[in-house]
């Protein structure tokens, strides 16, 4: 059977469910696919199809994640749901499934619970820009005051982590009742879909962002000059563009005099392309793997930053013992390792395998860095953790 062509007619948005265990994240995911498929087409997915999530690897870490898709009138959504709390933590920190917005599922019967709080904090740390709330299991509550109370609690909680708690849409419903075909609760799923369409702005496409290419290899071609190769992470590079080489050393300005792909000369390379870029007047020894090529003035080199990290458990091949302040592993950014020293938050004595924690890092060499940049923590060539830059300090 020929593969179906992916229809690109609607803008694409990445979302996911977050929230406390057993508050109904997977049931809601099933309800979204099932009920939206009836109206807009697409494949309905049952609870147990979503619940047995396949394993995948991201930055050397195994994560169980379910990916489903659904459509609304105006958009195509890719939606990620994780079976276990640890999978959420790993998923959000590694960026295995980048989210343009999250659906926070909170049971109306229980109100916010510890993981509700933890997932909101994680969303803040890893840069999930928008949260929409689905108050689930509303069929189990018949006290209007309780609804108001839970809603207020959720809004306060969101505000305490710098989300606009007063403005976040909150939809009250029951995913299970919707799946069972209760028309009033099916309507709530459409209401949630409309909230997604309205509240999460269409994300900027990778090609529309400023040009950035992590350098993987450097060659010198006699008579032509220096060529760097790598995959364009974002933006477009044209012949004649003024760019700079950032990271590890002093930032150098240069100009692109040629773009090659599969040994053919092109006028431009764009996000997702593996290209060779010819640099004017740049010496072979001035460039190395681990630096980036970028549009001038769009990214700067830094050595000190705060990050949210997940440390692998022993079972996952992580460390067998905790680490303490002044631990010095390697931090693998894009294409290279840089040694750095870890400082722990006040009151934190040590970090156990399998925990996630906020740290401050000082690198021995600068890296082209911005909030949201992902990295792996490695020791002796093996991954011991993963992290995301939550703020740049210096």
Curated annotation (Swiss-Prot):
Task: Please list the GO terms describing molecular function.
Answer: GTP binding; GTPase activity; guanosine tetraphosphate binding; translation elongation factor activity
Region listing for G3, in residue ranges: 81-84
Q: Locate the region G5.
A: 174-176
Q: Tell me the organism.
A: Neisseria gonorrhoeae
Domain of life per record: Bacteria
Q: Where is this region: G2?
A: 60-64
Annotated binding of Mg(2+), by residue:
26
Q: Does the keyword Metal-binding apply?
A: yes
Annotated localization: Cytoplasm
- State the family named in the UniProt similarity comment for this chain: Belongs to the TRAFAC class translation factor GTPase superfamily. Classic translation factor GTPase family. EF-Tu/EF-1A subfamily.
Query: What protein name is recorded for this chain?
Result: Elongation factor Tu
Q: Where is this region: G1?
A: 19-26
From the UniProt entry, list the residue stretches annotated as the region G4. 136-139
């Amino acid at each position: 059977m020929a593969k179906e062509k992916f229809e690109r007619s609607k803008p694409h948005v990445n979302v996911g469910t977050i929230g406390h265990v057993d508050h109904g994240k997977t049931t809601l995911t099933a309800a979204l696919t099932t009920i939206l498929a009836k109206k807009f087409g697409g494949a309905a997915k049952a609870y147990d199809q979503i619940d047995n999530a396949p394993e995948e690897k991201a930055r050397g870490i195994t994560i169980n994640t379910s990916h489903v898709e659904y459509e609304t009138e105006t958009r195509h959504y890719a939606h990620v749901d994780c079976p276990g709390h640890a999978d959420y933590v790993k998923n959000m920190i590694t960026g295995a499934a980048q989210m343009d917005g999250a659906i926070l599922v909170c049971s109306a019967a229980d109100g916010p619970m510890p993981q509700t709080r933890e997932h909101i904090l994680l969303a803040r740390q890893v840069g999930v820009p928008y949260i929409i709330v689905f108050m689930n299991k509303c069929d189990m509550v018949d006290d209007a005051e309780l609804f108001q109370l839970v809603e207020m609690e959720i809004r306060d909680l969101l505000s305490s982590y710098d989300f606009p708690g007063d403005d976040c849409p909150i939809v009250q419903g029951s995913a299970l009742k919707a799946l069972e075909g209760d028309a009033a609760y099916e309507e709530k799923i459409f209401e949630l879909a409309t909230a997604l369409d309205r509240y999460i702005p269409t994300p900027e496409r990778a090609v529309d962002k400023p040009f950035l290419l992590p350098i993987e290899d450097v060659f010198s071609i006699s008579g032509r000059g220096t060529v760097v190769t790598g995959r364009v992470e974002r933006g477009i590079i044209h012949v004649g563009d003024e760019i700079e080489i950032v990271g590890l050393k002093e930032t150098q300005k240069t100009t692109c005099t040629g773009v090659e792909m599969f040994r053919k000369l092109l006028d431009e390379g764009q996000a997702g392309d593996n290209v060779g870029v010819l640099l004017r007047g740049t010496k072979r020894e001035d460039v190395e793997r681990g630096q980036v090529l970028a549009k001038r003035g769009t990214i700067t080199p830094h050595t000190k930053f705060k990050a949210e990290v997940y440390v692998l458990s022993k079972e996952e091949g992580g460390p067998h013992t905790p680490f303490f302040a002044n631990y010095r592993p390697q931090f693998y950014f894009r294409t290279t390792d840089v040694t750095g020293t870890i400082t722990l938050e006040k009151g934190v004595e040590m970090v156990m395998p399998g925990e996630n924690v906020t740290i401050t890092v000082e690198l021995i060499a600068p890296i082209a860095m911005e909030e949201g940049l992902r990295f792996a923590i490695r020791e002796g060539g093996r991954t011991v953790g993963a992290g995301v830059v939550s703020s740049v300090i210096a």
